[in-house]
């Protein structure tokens, strides 16, 4: 593999001149530039990104660590993050933990060793990154998305899940439903707990009772919604409406109702959360709470880059406002 010294020798110039031509950081005459470029082409020379990053102490790379999920929300969020990285001249290294704490910490260590300029974390309270690893790299800026695992200087960006759960439930109440069930996500996740609290707050405000068995814990996945809805259908007092903690579980709810030969919303109204792309293509289109995923991804990258360039800034906690998307399921 050719080196910068090989290019300099062939072009008859110094290595610093080759560096200036490659980096375009100082004037070099057209004649010498042409010689260097010809040598680069002849030797098939590729500049070392590693050497450049060591020299500048910057890799223009951002690491992202997420828990495993087939939930389309995560793929849409990652897409927004990746697009925002590209638009700002950064590369994204994505690591999926698949719920394995050992794998998560190994991935975290790898990202840190690769000298990422910053880190995005989207995990859960029960699967936290190693405090010891994080403390070993105190200068790496970090943005937490949806939750903050431990005290520190990390910035936090989250959806107002409490308000979103309230909005969804109040919409069902305003539609005249009184027997409203809730399928929550895993209660080790702060958004799941807050959406449940929002549901309870709206029910209490309306003076509506929540029968035993009307709150079922799912897993934010398709199967979780399916199993939870089947459980609700076996309840002696079948609910008139269901608030599902995310759209992926709402897909499972639809399937359970289809197999039970029940129609949405004629027999049971359904409202979701996240507003994934699939929501508007379901039959009927899913009424849901919109999370601004592109805005969330863009904001996360902007906050992280701001932290990279100004590391002494005070910690930021930003909250995005959910919006009701009224369609045909409730």
Swiss-Prot record:
Residues 4-23 bind DNA. SUPFAM superfamilies: lambda repressor-like DNA-binding domains, Periplasmic binding protein-like I. GO terms for biological process: positive regulation of DNA-templated transcription; regulation of DNA-templated transcription. GO terms for molecular function: cis-regulatory region sequence-specific DNA binding; DNA-binding transcription activator activity; DNA-binding transcription factor activity; monosaccharide binding; transcription cis-regulatory region binding. PROSITE patterns: HTH_LACI_1 (PS00356), HTH_LACI_2 (PS50932). Gene3D superfamilies: 3.40.50.2300, lambda repressor-like DNA-binding domains (1.10.260.40). Keywords: DNA-binding, Repressor, Transcription, Transcription regulation. Residues 2-56 form the HTH lacI-type domain. Coiled coil: none annotated. Transcriptional repressor for the ribose rbsDACBK operon. RbsR binds to a region of perfect dyad symmetry spanning the rbs operon transcriptional start site. The affinity for the rbs operator is reduced by addition of ribose, consistent with ribose being the inducer of the operon. This is Ribose operon repressor. It comes from Escherichia coli (strain K12). The lineage of its organism: Bacteria, Pseudomonadati, Pseudomonadota, Gammaproteobacteria, Enterobacterales.
């Amino acid at each position: 593999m050719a080196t910068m010294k090989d290019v300099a020798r062939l072009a008859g110039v110094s290595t610093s001149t080759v560096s200036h031509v490659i980096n375009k950081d100082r004037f070099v005459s057209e004649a010498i530039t042409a010689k260097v470029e010809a040598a680069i082409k002849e030797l098939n020379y590729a500049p070392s990104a590693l050497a450049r990053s060591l020299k500048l102490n910057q890799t223009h790379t951002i690491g992202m660590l997420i828990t495993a999920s087939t939930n389309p929300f995560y793929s849409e969020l990652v897409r927004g993050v990746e697009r925002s990285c590209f638009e700002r001249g950064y590369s994204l290294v994505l690591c999926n933990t698949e719920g394995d704490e050992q794998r998560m910490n190994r991935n975290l260590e790898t990202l840190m060793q690769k000298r990422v300029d910053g880190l995005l974390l989207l995990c859960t309270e029960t699967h936290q990154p190693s405090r010891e690893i994080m403390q070993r790299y105190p200068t790496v800026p970090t943005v937490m998305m949806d939750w903050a695992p431990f005290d520190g200087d990390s910035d936090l960006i989250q959806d107002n899940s409490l308000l979103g759960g309230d909005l969804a439930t109040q919409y069902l109440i305003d539609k005249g439903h009184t027997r409203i069930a809730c399928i929550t996500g895993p209660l080790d996740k702060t958004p799941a707990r807050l959406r449940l609290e929002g549901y309870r707050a709206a029910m209490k405000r309306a003076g509506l009772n929540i029968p035993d068995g009307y709150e079922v814990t799912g897993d934010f996945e398709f199967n979780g919604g399916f199993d939870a809805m089947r459980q609700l259908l076996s309840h002696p007092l079948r609910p008139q409406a269901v608030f599902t903690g995310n759209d992926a579980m709402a897909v499972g709810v639809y399937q359970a109702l289809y197999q039970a030969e029940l129609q949405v919303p004629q027999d049971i109204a359904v409202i979701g959360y996240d507003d994934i792309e699939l929501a508007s293509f379901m039959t009927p289109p899913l009424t849901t709470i919109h999370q601004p995923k592109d805005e969330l991804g863009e904001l996360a990258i902007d906050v992280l880059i701001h932290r990279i360039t100004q590391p002494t800034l005070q910690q930021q906690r930003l909250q995005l406002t959910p919006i009701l998307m009224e369609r045909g399921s409730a």
